[in-house]
Amino acid sequence: MIRTKNIFLIGPVGAGKSTIGKQLAKQLKLEFIDSDDTIEKKCGVDINWIFDLEGEEGFRKRERDVIAEILAEKQNIVLATGGGAILDPDTRSLLSSRGKVVYLEATIEQQLERTAKDTKRPLLRVDDKKPVLEQLMAEREPLYRSIADVVVETNGATVKNIVNKISTFLVEETIL
């Protein structure tokens, strides 16, 4: 049996999924894919526009379909998912059955700092982001943990240190 090396990064907005994913893929010599970028390319519009037109439910359906399509076509990838991808039970099942799931944990303070000037996140287009982030975390944290093969805290760690922690885990799990 040929072992696939799919690595899925999940976690809240501002956890560093895309930044860490790019470096992890480079280190492991795997292809990096960002599901949000893929959705935007496929639809020809940005995520805010999709949310405005179709709502969160419409976006989550597109997200689920794009992730399923990526996994049907690609192997040996590092995939950074959107923060809410785990809300869909089919997406959770697909991720947990097709590779190793790495939950990048971030505090609310870290998320606030990293998203302070960000206008690309539809759920954070509000003046006071903290209560929104707290609500999202309360809703999503149990789902992140339910499918995570490993939890990596990102607070105060460098990208290099986080990538090394993930790589060490993958070696121990004999995926590398």
UniProtKB/Swiss-Prot annotation:
One GO location term (cellular component): cytosol
Associated pathway: Metabolic intermediate biosynthesis; chorismate biosynthesis; chorismate from D-erythrose 4-phosphate and phosphoenolpyruvate: step 5/7
Enzyme Commission number: 2.7.1.71
Keywords: Amino-acid biosynthesis, Aromatic amino acid biosynthesis, ATP-binding, Cytoplasm, Kinase, Magnesium, Metal-binding, Nucleotide-binding, Transferase
Residues reported in the UniProt entry to bind Mg(2+): S18
Primary location class: cytoplasm
Location in the cell: Cytoplasm
Protein name: Shikimate kinase
Family the entry assigns: Belongs to the shikimate kinase family.
Cofactor: record remark: Binds 1 Mg(2+) ion per subunit.
Binding site for ATP: G14, A15, G16, K17, S18, T19, R121
CDD domains given in the database record: SK
Essential cofactor(s): Mg(2+)
Residue sites binding substrate per the record: D36, R60, G83, R140
Gene Ontology molecular functions: ATP binding; magnesium ion binding; shikimate kinase activity
